């Protein structure tokens, strides 16, 4: 199976192309793409450097956030357009599954995933043994309580900083290990999702149209 992998919710574009469980292209190692935000340029590079064509792609996997909404929407729209124009299945993957897997692989611990939303709110979830739970859109007090409740048993992924908040007696806030997944990690998650996930022609980015939960 030829897979096109698209990740951008952290605001850093990365594209991969794989044949089965073997990566054929990873944009991270292409210095000519460094700093570019042109999704089409990344996809063209993936095909030109791998020798593959869009007609050979069996599935497009795209990071649907949560994260930077503009970047995520752009990449999801491009994935949907590719799928529609070429009759290719599109599968959306939760960004917290990607960064959760990445950090769990490195630390061998459950992972609390956090990213900022519209101030002062945050997205948060717990990734543990391949499962994502507690995903919610919360206020700052709730996310801080969640962090304190897990800081001795979990690792952290995403992007957050509570430095403006006075340190409590519990000590300093933990630091996220990573805010994006390597393309090899993305591929592992994608292939597992392919076995169980719904294959559609259109996916949607995770937005802030959620009820804010407060403590």
For each predicted feature, which ranges?
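Short glycine/serine- and small hydrophobic-enriched flexible loop segments
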Residues: 44-45, 84, 188-192
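Short amphipathic alpha-helical face segments that pack within enzyme cores
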Residues: 38-41, 77, 81, 98, ...
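DPxDG-like acidic metal-binding loop motif
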Residues: 59-90
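N-terminal beta-alpha supersecondary unit
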Residues: 1-66
């Amino acid at each position: 199976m030829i897979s096109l992998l698209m990740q951008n919710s952290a605001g850093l574009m990365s594209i991969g192309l794989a044949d089965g469980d073997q990566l054929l292209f990873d944009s991270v190692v292409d210095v000519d793409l460094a700093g570019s935000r042109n999704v089409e340029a990344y996809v063209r590079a993936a095909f030109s450097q791998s020798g593959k064509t869009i007609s050979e792609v069996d599935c497009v996997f795209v990071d649907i956030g949560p994260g930077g909404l503009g970047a995520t929407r752009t990449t999801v729209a491009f994935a949907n357009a590719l799928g529609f124009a070429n009759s290719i299945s599109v599968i959306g993957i939760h960004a917290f599954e990607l960064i959760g897997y990445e950090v769990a692989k490195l630390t061998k611990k459950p992972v609390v995933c956090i990213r900022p939303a519209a101030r002062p709110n945050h997205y948060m979830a717990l990734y543990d043994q391949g499962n994502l739970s507690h995903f919610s859109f919360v206020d700052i007090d709730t996310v801080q309580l969640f962090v304190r409740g897990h800081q001795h048993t979990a690792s952290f992924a995403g992007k957050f900083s509570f430095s403006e908040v006075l340190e409590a007696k519990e000590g300093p806030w933990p630091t996220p290990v990573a805010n994006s997944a390597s393309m090899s990690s993305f591929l592992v998650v994608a292939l597992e999702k392919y076995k169980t996930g719904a294959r559609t022609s259109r996916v949607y980015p995770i937005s802030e149209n959620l009820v804010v939960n407060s403590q």
